[in-house]
Amino acid sequence: MKIPLITEIQRFSLQDGPGIRTTIFLKGCPLRCPWCHNPETQDARQEFYFYPDRCVGCGRCVAVCPAETSRLVRNSDGRTIVQIDRTNCQRCMRCVAACLTEARAIVGQHMSVDEILREALSDSAFYRNSGGGVTISGGDPLYFPDFTRQLASELHARGVHVAIETSCFPKQGKVVESMIGIVDLFIVDLKTLDAHKHLDVIGWPLAPILANLETLFAAGAKVRIHIPVIPGFNDSHADIDAYAEYLGKHAAAISGIDLLNFHCYGEGKYTFLGRAGSYQYSGVDETPAEKIVPLAQALKARGLAVTIGGIVGIANGKNELTGDIALEVHH
């Protein structure tokens, strides 16, 4: 069984499914969405954050690194700083252990199913009283199907509501099929319905995602769709029409759709991971309401329940921005 590293266990979450939840973030995802705000969950291997503002240039990390990935240099104001080249990093994490100022931090911890259960079940009373539960997220939990199946089964057997957040990417349909019955809610990211863009930009074919999604629909599984509305990627009139047509055909099988506005909140993580140059959305503004509301209206017209996360509010049943369409909203 392929066992994932855990990047975070977030307790008392209100945004990853119904009620009060604990969200388990697994490290590893085969997709490479250029706007990803959790880049630390992409690579399945252990990594480290480097916080330059905490570094005092003592050189302890330089001394212990077997691959000589770090070296001391002087910056423009004459201060000694550490320069890191991660190309040959062996991921031994000796530099993290040697750092006295916590300028480095390990990303990804080893945890067994039993260890995760102990932590997640400690909040069972909150789940019961709020209609909440546990959400397995990532990364993508289907990147580790056996582990996810075991964790979901253990939670399900204890009466805990289980959700997973996934792109439904597996090319082997049996992976998704094996989750039906032990997962109470599938939260599926549907980033675009343009097959060429999906492959060229995200690096993964669209066909298996739609096939898996339709498997869930046919099985009567509870499915909620997340659509991240990304400027210049999936916010055109053609995109709106494609989403409305496809999802409208399956309206009866979809419990709701959440439109998520783009933001740059994760940009700093790329820098801390040594990947600052790979982030393509630096300086891009959040998705404007005029790009999200038409999509919400088109989906609502097809009989779908729609929420807009973090952009449009409701006051007395009226949309605060448009005044003409009442949408449920998550902040």
From Swiss-Prot:
Binds 3 [4Fe-4S] clusters. One cluster is coordinated with 3 cysteines and an exchangeable S-adenosyl-L-methionine. The gene is bssD. Its EC number is 1.97.1.-. Belongs to the organic radical-activating enzymes family. The keyword Translocase does not apply. S-adenosyl-L-methionine binds at residues 35-37, 139, 189-191, 263. Signal peptide: none annotated. Activation of benzylsuccinate synthase under anaerobic conditions by generation of an organic free radical, using S-adenosylmethionine and reduced flavodoxin as cosubstrates to produce 5'-deoxy-adenosine. It catalyses: glycyl-[protein] + reduced [flavodoxin] + S-adenosyl-L-methionine = glycin-2-yl radical-[protein] + semiquinone [flavodoxin] + 5'-deoxyadenosine + L-methionine + H(+). It comes from Thauera aromatica. This is Benzylsuccinate synthase activating enzyme. One of its GO terms (molecular function) is metal ion binding.
